[in-house]
Amino acid sequence: MNWIKKTLRFGEKIKTIIKARATKSEIANSDWTSCCKGPILKKDLEENLWVCPSCNKHHRISPHQRFDIIFGKNNYEVLKTPIPQDDPLNWNDAKPYKDRLRAARKKTGMDCGMMVVNTNIINLKITAIASDFDFIGGSIGAAEGEAFLYGIQHAIENEQPFVVFTSGGGMRMMESLISLSQMTRTTLAINELKKNNLPYIVVLTDPTAGGITASYAMLGDLHLAEPGALIAFAGARVIQGTVREELPVGFQRSEYVEKTGFVDLIVERKDLREKIGSLLSILLKKNSAINSSENETSEDSRTLTKAAS
């Protein structure tokens, strides 16, 4: 057999191996997924709130899954938010932006990458928002900005605390300056919320990065984070290329960020409901250890910290 035939046969073997690989849709529809120690049944992972029982990795989840876990199934009302015109810039790269939006909507069942709900937590009515990383990487465009502003407006009109679960890589490239302007809009909206003396709690989940970190994710009255969540502005390689120094291990993970003061508490997913409820009770001075205007001293601040722990 000459070398040409050997090459052709080798090529056929490669094709066979590639064909044998599972497709993205097959992986998504499989009963199995993988984590630290190999395959794990999705059913087992779901029963553990999508947290790996071996390594405690908090897997990414959709807004519906998150709200079901924290507020309970059928215990929240999804609010209809305004949806501006799709693709105002007629963006087209490897794939037209309108096609990307259609695919994201089909995949997630959402009109945009942010879900706003009216709900309650431990007998406190609140407005909550969560982003879906599966919707174009959780990036923020005009529609997501409108959803955020709608949530703030709803919270102010109903005098409710505002809780945000962040997840995403930043502002959406396909909307250029329209996307970047959402950083300003969300910041101004948060200022209005604070003028009305309404609590604003941010729960940082994996990943929270880019313009999200540089705007509404870091403006909360309190910042909670799930264990192991990536919290960053620029990527580690970009930073290392700029400073040209060895970076600390895990310096963009929630545990390290807590040590540097950007995160107040790291909370397990299973404990988020109780922790958010306790903190809101303290901030609103309802049935909590902090219940009078006298609690403004450093001693009382320690009481607040103890009650929240």
Regions found by a protein language model. Give the residues of each.
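Glycine-rich anion/phosphate-binding loops
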Residues: R102-A103, K107-G113, G138-Q153
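Short, basic, glycine/proline-bearing loop/turn elements
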Residues: C35, L101, A130-S139
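Intrinsically disordered, low-complexity segments enriched in small/flexible residues
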Residues: M1-M110, I121, L279-S309
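Conserved catalytic cores of soluble enzyme domains
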Residues: G169-S288
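Short glycine-rich loop/turn motifs
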Residues: C112-V116, Q160-P161, L198
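Conserved mixed alpha/beta catalytic, RNA-binding, or beta-rich assembly cores of soluble enzyme
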Residues: F133, G137-L149, E157, G168, ...
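A structural preference for short, pocket-lining loop segments at secondary-structure junctions
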Residues: T119-S131, A147-M171
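Structural motif
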Residues: K43, S131, F165, V203-L204
